[in-house]
Design a protein with these regions (language model features):
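Hydrophobic alpha-helical bundle cores within soluble ligand-binding/oligomerization subdomains
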Residues: 2-205
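Positively charged, low-complexity/disordered segments
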Residues: 206-210
Length: 210
């Protein structure tokens, strides 16, 4: 962090130094957190078009240039060369996994694909033509009531387990919402299938049986 800029009130002559924060990529950011105390003013930036609201070690985006990076990798490269769970592993742990690491990660995810039966009963309270996203949002929001052993955001292990759970269970919940709109019975996940194959099985198996 370095002080290369300052803001001056032309009416009073009072100046405030603005520290520049250099990111790994992209333009510098100015630390304006002391302006309200020193100058008695806020900044006005509708839509935060020129404001970085936080630091991120995961994502860099430049909409004007069409750039989207995850952990330094272009999103188009990840889409072309990596599977979903490889990218999920990258986002959580910071590096692309080795084969052994990916196998262990997939094993952990598959172990968490089942959803508590009482949680699935939530769908019985939704109308058959309810929007799937509304149903999924409601059920996901209720997960903390069933899996409350890993809700300490300050505990790295809790965050890791909950990340694995949400990656594993969200497709199961989404499939349940889809089946509910069709009036078809829920199809349980199969741990003998890979992650994406399981998603296809849960969505289409009942349709294929007719």
């Amino acid at each position: 962090m370095s002080t290369k800029y300052e803001l001056k009130n032309l009416a009073t002559g009072k100046t405030s130094p603005l520290n520049a924060i250099a990111g790994t990529i992209g333009p510098e950011a100015l630390d304006i957190s002391n302006l309200i105390k020193e100058q008695g003013v806020f900044t006005f930036d509708p839509g935060f078009m020129a404001t970085a609201s936080t630091e991120s070690k995961i994502t860099f985006i430049d909409g004007d240039l069409g750039v989207l990076l995850y952990r330094g990798y272009p999103v188009e490269q990840l889409a072309e060369k990596s599977c979903f769970l490889e990218v999920a592993n990258l986002l959580i742990y910071g590096t692309l996994p080795s084969k052994a690491q990916l196998d262990a990660f997939q094993k952990s995810i598959l172990r968490h694909t089942m959803v508590n039966e009482q949680l699935l009963r939530f769908f019985q309270g939704f109308h058959h033509n309810a929007h799937p996203m509304a149903m999924v949002s409601a059920v996901v929001a209720s997960m903390a009531a069933f899996y409350h052993d890993t809700t300490d955001i300050d505990d790295p292990r809790h965050r890791e387990i909950f990340a694995h759970r949400i990656i594993a269970k969200l497709p199961t919940i989404a499939a349940a919402a889809y089946k509910h709109t069709l009036g078809q019975p829920f199809v349980y996940p199969r741990n003998d299938l890979r992650y994406c194959a399981n998603r296809s099985e849960e969505h289409t198996s009942e349709l294929q049986s007719h």
